Amino acid sequence: TVSKEDKEKTIGCTGIYYANSMIPQGELELEKIVHSFAAKKFLNSYLLKEGVKEEKLNEELLKVVDIRYGKPYEDETTKKCDEFIFKLISGSKDEIKKIAESGIY
């Protein structure tokens, strides 16, 4: 089971990935956009499995997106989320990579 704190941090990171995935392609390398899409998709499923209600999740994600929308990509913030998620959820790095490579977001 994931602690409440880790769950909240995961939701925060999911929101960051979501916001990143909305950055126009000309402003950010496609690879980073695709990684963010894949991470958002993976974490969405993960959080629902962990018992987060879909409505609450969407609400929380939109809060993060509202704050970050239109702001430039933050490498440091995204890297910290990657590290946190890869450590928290075993196999997540490979799963996210698989989603990114499958081209299905």
Give, region by region, the residue ranges found by the protein language model.
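Compact alpha-helical subdomains of small soluble proteins
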Residues: 30-105
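A broad "ordered helical/assembly scaffold" signature
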Residues: 1-2, 96
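Short N-proximal segments of mature Sec-exported proteins
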Residues: 2-51
